[in-house]
Structures are given as C-alpha cells and as structure tokens.
Amino acid sequence: VPVSRPDADGCCGLGISNYAWRTIFENARTVIFEINERLPRLQGVDGSHRVHLSEADFIVEGEHEPLPIRTYRDPSAVDIEIAKRVVEEIPDGAVLSLGVGGVPFTVANMLAQSDKTDLGCHTGTISDAFLALYKAGKLTNKKKEIDNGYSTWNLAMGSQELYDWLDNEPQLFHPADVDYVHSPYRIGEMK
C-alpha cells in the first residue's frame, strides 16, 4: 500500500489514488506499506484516509520518481464553445464533478473568471481545474449537502502545483474510496 511519509504520531496518508486501499489492506493477510516521500500527507476527514505505521506488517522505504504530471493542451474552438454552454447552466453553489481533459479544464477556467460563487467539489478525479477554481476564490464547498467544507475526490492527477496544494492544505480535502465517491445514494444527496 503506498503511503505518505509519517507525521510526528506515526500516521500516514493513503496517497493520491484512493480506489480501495483501506478495504484492501483491512482484508489482507499481510500488509506492506511503501513510504513514498513524494505523496501528499493527506489524512482525510476524521482520519478516513489515515493509517498508522503499526497497521503494517512490513514497511518499505526508498527514493521515488516524481508523481505523474498531467499537462493540458490549449482548448480548441469546440472545447470553448462546449464550455460556454456548460458554464451558462451552472448555478451558484453547484457541486461539480469535472473529468480530465480540454473541456473540463476550459469549463473550470471559465467558471474561475465568472461571477459564480461557492462552488463545491465531489469528483472522481481532482485536477488542476479545481485548483484554478480555488485560486479564484470560487471553490468553497460551503453549500455542499454532504462533506460540507471539503473537496471530496477519489484520485488526484495534475501538476506538481496540484500535489503541493494537496500536501500544504490537507484540511480542505476528503480523499475517499471509490465506493464512497461514486455511490449513487451519496450523489443523490447533492443538488
């Protein structure tokens, strides 16, 4: 199980890919934590994304390659036209799930420059699109019906700046297993 470097209490975060690590290691006969010094130290809401070193049977440490970086191309004319139409339909306080690619990134950039306020994040993949909204003061998560105040996501993919944001401000995030993020019941609780 890939984990972040431990904090002073010996707790580690479960990294940028949260598909089902907790479920996997809670059901495994042998648990090996691989400490990756490059992973953000996210520990989740109420420790939902936290593990203690004592929960591992073995711990492996070593040097790691930089995290994968996602780059974005300039938006095409079609991306821009689609994004304009989408942005027109998004009300203040909307909870967003943005994918990865030209259109979602263009939507986020247009929202960042718009008069929309108090947007929320409940998404499979948190990316630089959400970072752009946060930097513009648009991403507050204030009006979310669940996980109020937190950006909820299952996978992080983007720039080093995105990973640094996750590492430096972990109190803003609720990284969660795929069954939590994509639960139809949970999604149905939001407007």
Identify the meaning behind each predicted range.
Residues 1-191:
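Conserved alpha/beta enzyme-core scaffold
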